[in-house]
Design a protein with these regions (language model features):
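Short pre-catalytic strand/loop immediately N-terminal to key active-site residues, enriched for Gly-Thr
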Residues: 79-86
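Active-site-flanking beta-strand signature of metal-NTP-handling nucleotidyl enzymes
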Residues: 66-70
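N-terminal amphipathic, basic helical "cap/leader" segment at the start of enzyme domains
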Residues: 1-62
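Short hydrophobic alpha-helices that are characteristic scaffold elements of the AMP-binding
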Residues: 100-101
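Active-site glycine-rich loop that binds ribose-phosphate moieties when present
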Residues: 87-91
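Conserved small/polar residues in nucleotide/adenosyl-binding loops
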Residues: 110-111
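Residue-level detector of anion-binding/catalytic polar loops
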Residues: 105
Length: 111
């Protein structure tokens, strides 16, 4: 994974602000992520259906590993937040390309 994250950090980054953060989740960490998904979903919608609850419960187990991308943008006089968010998107693309080049199957999803 070191190679993959090195590729991610080569994404365009105006002013070298380094806005991208990555969280790698696998194994038992997916249980905690499942709980976070359910808790957040309940906070956003108090009337979740059983189908929705099942979706959020099972989502982290669709893959053996999950990489979460976070854009931690900073105030800067010449670099607006949108450029920093796009930089994180480019880092995500580099992750996908690196994993593909290494022979891994992958997908980009949101729930």
């Amino acid at each position: 994974m070191e190679t993959v994250f090195k590729a991610a950090l080569r994404a365009p980054d105006h002013a070298w602000l380094k806005p991208s953060r990555f969280i790698q989740i696998s194994g038992n960490g997916r249980n905690k992520l499942s709980q976070i998904f359910i808790k957040t979903a309940h906070e956003l919608n108090k009337e979740l259906t059983e189908t929705q609850i099942l979706k959020y419960t099972e989502a982290p187990f669709r893959a053996p590993m999950i990489i979460i991308l976070i854009s931690n943008y900073k105030e800067h006089p010449k670099v607006p937040p949108i450029e920093q968010i796009i930089s994180t998107g480019c880092a995500g693309q580099n992750i996908l390309l690196a994993l593909n080049a290494l022979g891994y199957g992958l997908s980009l999803i949101h729930i």
